[in-house]
Curated annotation (Swiss-Prot):
Gene Ontology cellular component terms for the protein in this record: tRNA methyltransferase complex
Cited PANTHER family: 3-DEOXY-D-MANNO-OCTULOSONIC-ACID TRANSFERASE/TRNA GUANINE-N 7 - -METHYLTRANSFERASE, PENTACOTRIPEPTIDE-REPEAT REGION OF PRORP DOMAIN-CONTAINING PROTEIN
Keywords (A to Z) from UniProt: Methyltransferase, S-adenosyl-L-methionine, Transferase, tRNA processing
Biological source species: Shewanella halifaxensis (strain HAW-EB4)
Reaction catalysis annotation: guanosine(46) in tRNA + S-adenosyl-L-methionine = N(7)-methylguanosine(46) in tRNA + S-adenosyl-L-homocysteine
Active-site residues (renumbered): 143
Descriptive protein name: tRNA (guanine-N(7)-)-methyltransferase
Length: 237
């Protein structure tokens, strides 16, 4: 079990770590996940430190870096890393079974351009990622907190948009996706109001799913049931 934190901010836009009144029961790691954590973490794992990491040192090369917040079980992240060996990928996930599953899949796929954090994403972004160092930040299917009284817990808020902007290089892209239409509207409102961004949609709203974002099994099932998915892409200018 681990405490669950939520991205809340004060009036000045300062991130506040707040612990909700329940704990998340993560479930036990499978044998394969535990083995991957033991064998692959020394290779692909990044231990959190409160100072900026050197991406060239971490990956052993200079290349554009893509960072994904909350990669779940990691299947799509591994697929993207395998499809784009010229890019560096960093994934951040708080659920240990997901980290183990991602490491196992990455090892099986022979991926070498992926590193992962098992830590709070906001803390990693604030303290470990240098300003202007990322080519892309991906936030796919974050918790929608669909009840109105919980909307303040949504990770996409004005201070979060500014935090991401500060980590992107000029020309870098913040790519968001959600299967909740109300959350897509919230995302669009926040991002359109955020300074230093340009919406990549020709119509000023959402974009078609780009080929580089794999269609997940969950998403494919949603399409069959008539559920929508909304992608937003904003460029740092």
């Amino acid at each position: 079990m681990s405490d669950v934190t939520t991205a809340e901010f004060n009036e000045e836009g300062k991130y506040l770590r707040k612990v909700r009144s329940f704990v998340l029961r993560e479930g036990r790691l499978t044998k394969g996940q535990a083995q991957a954590m033991e064998q692959q973490w020394p290779i692909m794992g990044l231990d959190y430190t409160p100072e900026s990491i050197d991406l060239v040192e971490v990956f052993g090369r200079e290349a554009d870096t893509v960072l994904e917040i909350g990669f779940g079980m990691g299947a799509s992240l591994v697929a993207m890393a395998k499809a784009s060996p010229e890019l560096n990928f960093i994934g951040i996930e708080v659920h240990k079974p997901g980290v183990g599953a991602c490491l196992a899949e990455a090892a099986e796929a022979g991926v070498t351009n992926l590193r992962v954090y098992h830590h709070d994403a906001i803390e990693v972004l604030e303290n470990s990622i240098a300003e202007g160092s990322l080519a892309c930040v991906q936030l796919f299917f974050p918790d929608p907190w669909h009840k109105t009284r919980h909307h303040k817990r949504r990770i996409v808020q004005a201070p979060f948009a500014e935090l991401i902007r500060s980590k992107l290089k000029v020309g870098g892209v913040f790519h968001l996706a959600t299967d909740w239409e109300n959350y897509s509207e919230h995302m669009l409102e926040v991002m359109n109001a955020a300074p230093g961004y340009k919406n990549q949609s020709a119509t000023g709203d959402v974009v078609e799913r780009p080929d580089h974002r794999p269609l997940t099994k969950f998403e494919a099932r949603g399409h069959r049931l008539g559920h929508g998915v909304w992608d937003l892409m904003f460029e740092r200018v």
